Amino acid sequence: DDESIQQAWQILTNGIYNCPAGNNQQGPHESIFCGRPSLNNFQASSWSKMCNYYDPTTTAEAARLMVSVAHKYRGNNNFEYDLVDITRQAIADRARIVYNYAVADFKSFDKKNYNTHTRQFLELLIMQDKLLGTRKEFKVGNWIQQARNLGSTSEEKDLYEWNARVQITTWGNRYCADIGKLRDYAHKEWNGLLRDFYYKRWEKYWQVLQDQLDGKLPVLPVGNSSTPTADNPAMTIDWYALEEPWTLAKNTYAASAEGDCIEVAKEAITLINN
């Protein structure tokens, strides 16, 4: 038995794994990275229910404890999987906190802190992408490769790849994504998808808000609408036009693990604590 590992699991047991009775959310907490950006981002899918039933800082402490003893378990597949998965959640939870800071900065016209927090948010997203690249289970390349392997001809392979890409992003054409609100229904925190799909959305969004703060665009009233109205600055962006090119692309993603998961997890903990 390892005291640090036991403590880490106890923290998770008392926190994120301790969903209270009566909570009717549809599955686990959804990552802030994976939903279309807005000023009231809480979940990724359009209909899922979520509530803050645990302290989001506790996952970082659990990850820190795992990292502190990781050298003793190098090469242990089960430990390394858990290390990456727990650290993945810690990054997402920290990003949600930083997101709230950035939104508050925008609403108060605090450009200095807005720049700081939006930069931190994007750094966390890229760090999660790097971390998940160390495990094949968290790589979009593995998903796409499996889809292409089902095809017998080049045409079939391309079709199956398109289906694989669409399923985890827009779920179909513009109508499905925007009117049907099926976008991000099957979102994934996966290496490759994070940096090439989710990062581009958030980078664009933060820049639009930055332009508003800089007077390059009119600062629109802050509302709670998720539809294209003047009350929602996010909707000055045509999200589907930004998303569709990735679903049509044929760029190759590595399917095998890349990098040292323990060393990258250490980097992630340092970034979370900054």
Where are these regions (language model features)?
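Substrate-binding groove of N-acetylhexosamine-processing glycoside hydrolases
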Residues: 1-274
